[in-house]
């Protein structure tokens, strides 16, 4: 099976914090040209700062720009099942390839509550649903046994694991081996190649916003059986990640590194961190080191 890379696409903003849809379309074109698929309205896309209407329009714009040249997954997850369901139904009508559902945040959920939440959404739409686990941000974790139970649902197609723990990723991969049709997509940038070698269907990476060619290079080399080249590209990716993420919150650093390559990306909506000249100077040094400027 050909493995696939998705970029967790940034959302571009104007100076007045309205969405810059044309700049976002430009980022879509850049990623598709590199050979990557798109995930929009996720963690790297400032989804918590977007309104319902903005998420719907953003998805329409992305799908229109992609025009069938790549796959599009969009995140519908919100704290309440009700709002998640409304978004999922809207995305279902637009015609995306998959709907990711991040675990509810702020609200503490039991595993039974998570099963009910995801199943309710999956029952309501025809588009395949992908579970999205990122416990460091949501404080709710999809246990591997819960993933196994949900994998039996006919419209739950897989999981994006952004937990960062290799042990959990291994457990999800075991579920995929036992449940045909259930796919695992790795989120941690340093585990892209490892996850591919151990049965993942692909990855969904935020760092690919800054290094689209390197991300695509890992996947293309792996799919071609050139493991040495895949390892070389993964080493670049992992080193860039280490250098960049040492400066601050990962999605913010990705967005800022992209802004310093292309200012049309804009800053994130407040209360995101304001630009810091000293930090920018350090990011520029990293970008130059990796020949991005």
Descriptions of predicted regions:
Residues 2-141:
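Active-site beta->alpha loop and helix N-cap motifs at the rims of alpha/beta catalytic domains
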Residues 4-12, 34-35, 90, 198-200, ...:
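C-terminal alpha-helical cap/extension of soluble enzyme domains
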Residues 21, 25-28, 144, 277-287:
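Short, amphipathic alpha-helical "lid/cap" segments that border enzyme active or binding sites
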Residues 24, 55, 59, 84, ...:
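A general structural signal for well-ordered alpha-helical segments in protein cores
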Residues 34, 65-69, 94, 124, ...:
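Alpha-helix C-cap/termination motif
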Residues 124, 137-238, 245:
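Catalytic alpha/beta core domains of metabolic enzymes, predominantly
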Residues 133, 155, 269-270:
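Glycine-rich phosphate-binding "P-loop"
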